[in-house]
Amino acid sequence: RYTYETNVMGTVNLLECIRLYPSASSVLNVTTDKVYENKEWEWGYREIEALNGFDPYSNSKSCSDIATQSYIKSFFSRETSPAISIARAGNVIGGGDFSKDRIIPDSVEACSKNEVIHVRNPYSIRPYQHVLEPLSAYLWIIFRQDSDHSLADCYNVGPNEDDCVTTGKLVSLFCDCLLYTS
């Protein structure tokens, strides 16, 4: 329940503030690539694909995305409205990521304790990207749409398909960098 309250109602509350106190000129809702209905495709999803995240986290992000689109169509379609976009990013890794079940922090911890690194889905291909890459895209979207509202849209933010690796490969590369064997 808390996940929905945070991701859906948090988005609605923010959009309501923007609607009632129109001082923002450029807004970006950052969701996740997990908003898409998972069809087990081998290729990445496009911005036009159906939204329907399966698990509660992914589904709450789908709902946040849909709520944003609803507000855009209902309240922010005038020329004087703020430009509002949605960015959907894949797996972001980098500094400050100490949440539970995170591949890099978990690998660092296992290495520091000389333990085996446990990889839940070693063959899962994910669009891993360093936190500065999507951040750069977010800032670019906000900056550009502020002066050209026609750029307000939904954007997938991630690496090229050729740069996506399996989780197992990511851990292997990490271990190679540390000269660690799990």
Task: Place the predicted regions along the sequence by residue.
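Residue(s) in the substrate-gating loop at a strand-loop-helix junction
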Residues: T32
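Alpha-helical substrate-binding/gating segment
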Residues: P105-I117, Y128-Y155
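Hydrophobic alpha-helix immediately C-terminal to the catalytic Tyr-X-X-X-Lys motif of short-chain
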Residues: C63, A67-Y71, S107, L170, ...
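Short-chain dehydrogenase/reductase
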Residues: T11, L15, T68, L135-Y138, ...
